[in-house]
Amino acid sequence: MTREITVGGVKIGGGRPLALVAGPCVIENETATLRCAERLMSICNGVGISLIFKASYDKANRTSVTAFRGPGMKEGLRILAKVKEALGVPVLSDIHSIEQVEPAAEVLDVLQIPAFLCRQTDLLVAAGNTGKVINVKKGQFLAPWDMKNVVGKISSCDNDNIILTERGASFGYNNLVVDMRSFPIMRSTGYPVIFDATHSVQLPGGEGTSSGGQREYVEFLSRAAVAAGVDGIFMEVHEEPEQALCDGPNSVRLDDMPALLKKLKAIDAIVNQ
């Protein structure tokens, strides 16, 4: 069993019921972000699943230089602070440099380390020194057993508020696969593990100037991951994925979330009997 991590009023790991980290890929604007958060809260309250709201203020690794990146750190954190205050929900976003750590930590309940940056020692240590909960996305290039070294960098700061997230492994060009063995391997570090169900079905750079995705496989992989014992599920959602400014092809439609979460909750209940 992993240690229990507390994020606001949400508890992850330690045998607790499945938690959800969800929200749009990127903050498109204040109105849409608040509307998405309100809808997710309503859905999660109805199903009985705890929510951490996620949204990126800057998508710093978009495929094309012309792709929409978000409102930037200052405006994005303002919007996330408003979501947190209005709904009482914990909030999560990515940090990309040491300079972002301190201002982000003033607002965010969880500092997320992007997959491409998961081995950057200075960033991990700076994040760890805040004492905040740190969610590290496992790089697409990293073996699951290598995450113990990532954990060691953060825990060296006397910070054990660590969550690890599986988001698929590179499989040739423009493709990812999920190795279900990674869940027990990563959980053997003693920290909770979350499955990023939507980035795992991404086709990186698969559309030339943007990434593609296979949304139709999100449910299948999510069900398998919950059956394998993950502590939480990470999903990017959107009212109209076809109109999303980032990662639409692999985002889940908000209308589809209630039925999906009910299935995942039922599987989790069986696993944790």
From Swiss-Prot:
Recorded superkingdom: Bacteria
Alphabetical GO biological process terms: keto-3-deoxy-D-manno-octulosonic acid biosynthetic process
EC number(s) reported in the record: 2.5.1.55
Disulfide bonds: none
Record carries keyword Glycoprotein: no
Pathway: Carbohydrate biosynthesis; 3-deoxy-D-manno-octulosonate biosynthesis; 3-deoxy-D-manno-octulosonate from D-ribulose 5-phosphate: step 2/3; Bacterial outer membrane biogenesis; lipopolysaccharide biosynthesis
Cellular localization per UniProt: Cytoplasm
Chemical reaction(s) catalysed: D-arabinose 5-phosphate + phosphoenolpyruvate + H2O = 3-deoxy-alpha-D-manno-2-octulosonate-8-phosphate + phosphate
GO CC entries: cytoplasm
Transmembrane segments: none
Keywords, in A-Z order: Cytoplasm, Lipopolysaccharide biosynthesis, Transferase
Pfam families: DAHP_synth_1 (PF00793)
Example of a GO MF term: 3-deoxy-8-phosphooctulonate synthase activity
Root EC class: transferase
SUPFAM superfamilies from the UniProt entry: Aldolase
PANTHER family xref list: PHOSPHO-2-DEHYDRO-3-DEOXYHEPTONATE ALDOLASE (PTHR21057)
Family that this chain belongs to: Belongs to the KdsA family.
NCBIfam families cross-referenced by the UniProt entry: KDO8P_synth (TIGR01362), PRK05198.1 (NF003543)
Name of this protein: 2-dehydro-3-deoxyphosphooctonate aldolase
Provenance organism: Citrifermentans bemidjiense (strain ATCC BAA-1014 / DSM 16622 / JCM 12645 / Bem)
Taxonomy of the source species: Bacteria, Pseudomonadati, Thermodesulfobacteriota, Desulfuromonadia, Geobacterales
